[in-house]
Curated annotation (Swiss-Prot):
It comes from Neosartorya fischeri (strain ATCC 1020 / DSM 3700 / CBS 544.65 / FGSC A1164 / JCM 1740 / NRRL 181 / WB 181) (Aspergillus fischerianus). Keywords: Activator, Nucleus, Repressor, Transcription, Transcription regulation. Residues 18-114, 1514-1547 are annotated as: Disordered. This is Mediator of RNA polymerase II transcription subunit 12. GO terms for biological process: regulation of transcription by RNA polymerase II. Residues 99-114, 1518-1538 have a biased composition (Low complexity).
Amino acid sequence: MIPHSSAGVQSWGQPLHAVYSGTGRADLSQPLGQPDRQPEQPSMPVPQLQGRPPALIDLTTNDGDVLEREPPAKRLKIDVHAGSVAGDGSPASAGVGESKSTPSATTSKPPSLSWRARPVWSFQALLSEVSGSAEINGESAAGVVQDVKPPPPPSFPGPPWKFAPADTIASDSAGAQDGAPSKEVQTTPYHIETPSVAPVIRGEKVADFSPWMGNHPEDVLNEQTAKQGYYDRTQVSQNESNTARPSLYAQLKHRSGLQILSSVFAAALEKRQGHNMVTAPSTFKPPPRVTLTDNKREAWLRDLANPNVPLRKLSRTIPHGIRGRVLLDQCLTKWVPVGRAVWLAKCVGANEIRAFKRKGTSGALAIGLEAKWVRDWTANVQQFLEGVITSCGVADWKMKMTYAVSLTARLFFEQLLDHDQYLGWFLTSLEAAPFNTLPVWLLMLGIYWSNILRYRKRGRRLAELLLDKLQVAIKSDSATSLRPLTDRLSLHIRKLTLEHTSSMVLPQSWEKYKDLLSSCLDLNDNVHRAVFQNLAERNARVQRPRKCEETTQQPPQQRVIQLFDSIGSSNDITSVSAASLGAIDDKAALVLKLLEWAATPFRYGVSRVYTGARLLRKWKIAGVDVDTSIISFLGESQMRDQLNMDNIYHIVSELVRSQTFSVGKYLQWLMAKGVADFPQNSDHQPLSGDLALLMQLPVSRLPEHVHNLRNTLLHRAGVEVSKESSTIAILKASIAERLPRIFGSVATSAVSRDPLPSDLTWAVKSELGQWIRRGVTEFGRDPRRAFQDLHSAPSAEHFALTPGEFYTVRDILESFGDLSILADVLKQATVCNDGIVLASAADTVNYHFRSFCVIGATTDLFKRLVESYARLKRLGSTSLDLIFSLIDLGLRLPGELNTVALLRQDLSRIESKSSMAAPSPLSDHIPSSFNETDPLFLLKLDQLLSSASGIDESTLDTIFNLLIKQIESSGGHAKLSVNETCRYLSYLRPFHPKRFDIMIVRWICGLLRSTTGGILSQVLPPLIGVGCVTIQAFVFLVRRLLKSENMMSNQRDLRIDLLQLLVPPPAGQSRYFDMVTYRFHLSRKEFLFKHPEEVFDIIRDAIALIDSQSQEGNYRQVDLGHSAMVLLQILLTKNPESAVKHCTEKLIGQHPSAVTVLTRALDSLLGLDTKAGERLFTSNGSFIFITIDTGPAAPDISVAEKVIELTNDFSLPFCRLKLQLLFNAETKGDVRNEIVDVMFKAAVADSRSRRSNWVGLVRLMSHDAVRQIRERAEKNFFAIPLFEESPDGCSSFAADNSSSLETAKLYLAIIEKLAYSIPDVGPQAVVPVLTEKMDLLLQRLITMQANYSGTTELSHGVDAEHMIRSRTQFERALAFWFSALLRMIVLHRTAFSVPSAAVRPSALPEQTRLLISIFCITLARLPDSVLRLFPAADYFPHSMTAGDCRPCPGILLQTHALDVAASLIDTFPDEARHQCARYLREKCPPFARVQNDSRFLYLLGPLGDSPSSNITLPVSIPSPAASGSTPAPTPSGNPTGGFSHPQQPAFVSGVPTGLPDGLNCAASHLCLQYRGRAIGAYPVRPWELLEDAAPIAGTNDTAVSLGYFDARRVRV
């Protein structure tokens, strides 16, 4: 059955009614006969006053009160009433066919067929049920209390014409409540009318209805009728007077009695069905339009606005000229009720559309003209609504806005507009709406919310639109006043995110809006947080890297290395220890990484040794097996060549001293391993790393048996133990000879005056260091020395260290590198009263600040030094040197700022006292007495500087000039050293600081301008050491002079001297420095740490002089290159990342010589083969340079390979810099290709080893080289076969194909890391390859499904197990390749876009094929549901464990595939989408059920939902002949067979056209029947769903003949 012409689609805002809930049938929403509790809605909106519009309504609500003045929803069935047949034309007949709006009547609940299952024998049965229910309702109170007896049988029903069904009564009563019209004057004589409820019998007669005519026998009044009444005396036989049971029982008892009875009943039903069948031809035609005058047209419109005027009367004279925008404006002006306005629009539209077919046009042209007319009509509606919105602020604007929105919404939901065009215009208008009209559009958004979000094409656009509006509102200047609007936008965004999450998958704009979206959600709520995490993961998987970026999540090894490097600045050992233990689960690997960090040549400083020792102690306490890890580290022979093993032995020595390392365990392991027996004379045979540790172990605290075992193992290994003892004895004698006061005098013959050897073992160093510490401690508290003079009080001077002794002890311990012993010596030195020693001790702590901080001695030593300073202050012997040193040291201690402030107060007090003291009259004669030839010159100078009186400026000038002459003459007759002279200058400065600074600057400028070479390098270090000059100020002065005075004759020497000033001495050189020289080294070290950028500038300016012409020969060039290389190595190892950045900015590309020196420095660090120009180490540690080639070195392919092999976590910055130098060199194309080959092999090897160092190396290459590496990886990836077939047949696949999958995964990882090299337009060559691969994957899936389904029933036993195993392997491989190809599609998505596809004619078929393959594989129903696994972070599926209860464990592979398809559909043209949907509708594989999948419709819709594309009913199909029986059901054959019918070309491409977008609409299930079977869907034409289309309603007054559907009349 199809709807009546008065029926329609679901009205706006009203729920659908049951399809079969008409009058005369049981209403499923409530008991039969029970009155409807919901008040009836009036059929048309009646204004309160004529011309007054309705009140403003809420446009976003979805309740029934929105249409409180709208007609109720139409019944979706055929109701042919007797009243309508009579056609009296009364107003009451206009309401026939309108049903009540019951909330519970929905289309989801099928109607009851009780009235069709049993025949209605009489209207008594209907009345019986009505009376029974009414009785129950009337006695409900008593029935609840007294429900002990069974209910009595229903009473005998009365005649049907005395009572009517409850719903008819209710409708009549509701209609009576409407506005009572004025009673019409009868113009014709009264005649008797037959009751509409009376039963009709054959011959159009009515049963038991005899109206009074005056001539009936009972109307004759006589004596008999007066006495006895009138009655019919019918002759009744005897049988009729008795019961019929005996006669019927004989028939029923017979064998065929029931069949006869059934035949009788079936014949009766067949007769009734045939009698009720609609056989009349269709009499429907749209109401005609007539030409009227303006006055009559206005009168007609006023009648249309009056709800009391029936539409049937108005349908006779619809005026011409009311169409389009005029129609809508007239309805708005006259306040025509919305329902009647829609009726007028339908009448006009139906006539306009039928006009196209009456002109003799072809079918295709008529459809095109209809589509054009609908689009024009939609444009008129849009203009009408825009005009009302723009008239904001005028009178009655709210009421007009309410009416306009209601009318347009009703037109939209009545399917009278082009949905795609209208919703597209709505989104465009919403996007362009300013803030003052945006609330109106947001209100209308609530009306079309579900229609917009039904398909992704509109939903994604709406999501981005709302987010953009919210972002603009938040960032606007009037954000406070827009707060209600932003709250409204946030509410819409939150609702969209929670209810339509897939619309928030935004591949192009997620990074832009993700923070804004998170602010709209309540992340404290578990649901909101889970949804946002799911969205973030889904969006991350469909995005490709836009640029070269470092990985956000570092490997654990890189993380712990950063923690180790951070100790130098934070000095927080405890937190770094805990963080390191939590970063790596494998504690042995953690210990190995720490030892590598401490011994690598790519880090700087001895503080790493003490950092490693302290961390290992903490880890040992935490339960880590440190001993085993150290022993296994030493057993790896490949590590010795790349590491400084002396640092490792130093760490073990520190651990042995603190009894943290188990020497016994190590010796047991060594014996278990076996010690090789070396001959005694094999001195040239190097020992292995684990055996060399045996020589390094300190033996002072070892038990005797362990000591003896060590000596035994050393003797077996060929090491002379006695040689170690003799070495210790000789060195002790040498040290004692240099420190006789501490260790006593020794025989001169036993003393070796050679410097201490540099190859001492830590066994010797530790023994000597402990011996020195013990000697210094005993010397400081020896009672014999303290009390040798009983008559004099003991003084600290008797047993305190002198400056010379302190310098010697410090020099010895620093040459050993034993800073822990040096810290104990400094602690003993703090008890003396010598200001020089205390100042030198403070400078020593400052020089080794990082190491002492790790040891934990810095704060204690500083406090002891401050206490010593306080003691000296009380004694009146304040030392400026000590104050300067303490201030410099205290500034590096954050917790000692108060102490530093006090020290600065003392310093300023002393300086102000000297500068403000008045000079005595005797000072006028002082200059004449001062003479450099005077033997008492030093004595007089000391007396003058130590006196309390001041010095005038002339005296200051005289003394300054004398001291300057002493410096220039290298001591003069007074025999002052340069250091002592500079110290006197520092004592002279506090008297007149400003004048002194001016004089010293003038003198230094004179030295810089002079041609005398070498004097600056001798004078400047002492001046820096005493504090008269700073390195930074001197560098600034030199640059200023070089810029202002371009004609300086010695610019080259000045630059070279400045460079050499910053170069520290070699490690093997003696470090016996006095206080002034030591302070200079401290200042140079601080300058290198704090100002690396300026040092690089100095190196760049000095290296540029190598190529210039010089008269000094090659020696000066070699010296310059060596100095620059040493400085570069120090800077690179102190802070690798920033140093590499400075090298790239300041050296590479600036000068060829700079590249050459940088290359040599890197080669020395990386340990590459030495070449011409590289440094060679001699036995004493000095450097010898041969030559330096100033031209750029040609890159060697072997060098690149070796650099790549040397790449690890520590050398990565240096290897990157080295490769960058190789890539930047001007070489031929074949060499570049070879380098690309090397890098590709390195990338594959590192990826297979799960390392990521190759990424940093490849990033340095040019964009073209990176593209070549990625293309090679893509080529190898596509070359891997999808499935490896086993040799036994093609139906089963190899069980072990993990190797090919791992290889593919490796190449895919390389491609993904280099995805930033993919151009924005996308490589076109990869598109057909990806399409073919995905198509091949689908074909394999179809083949395997067919093979498995064909062999399932035949296989059993071992074959069945083999088949199951083969199928499982196939599905796993399918999931892997599917996820891998999806990732490739994501990376190359831009290649499929429309601009790129425009240059290829095959772009559209490729896009369609790709979508089809993705949909078919995604929605395939595999036995193991492998596509429903959770992909891991690398996009490959893995099973989820039962205990994994994370709130967002991941997205399904199926969901990810649909997201990829959505991202493609966003960029594909609509034609590709339509072709994909058409193919899937017609030829979808049987294992993929996409037709009824909501996700499929969401992604591929909308598919031609314009009503203009409706299909006209073919005239050649005749009406099915009524066979007198119910038509046979549709055959259950191929469900898609009907979709390929040539008469249905439009419906197979998507959603039925002309219907609402929802698939639950009842009209979308109507099927055209032909010869007893359904041949296709019938699209209802919304323009012809007209009620009251004709003045007299006929039996078949519908737009299409009801005979096509075997429709039957329902008599009520």
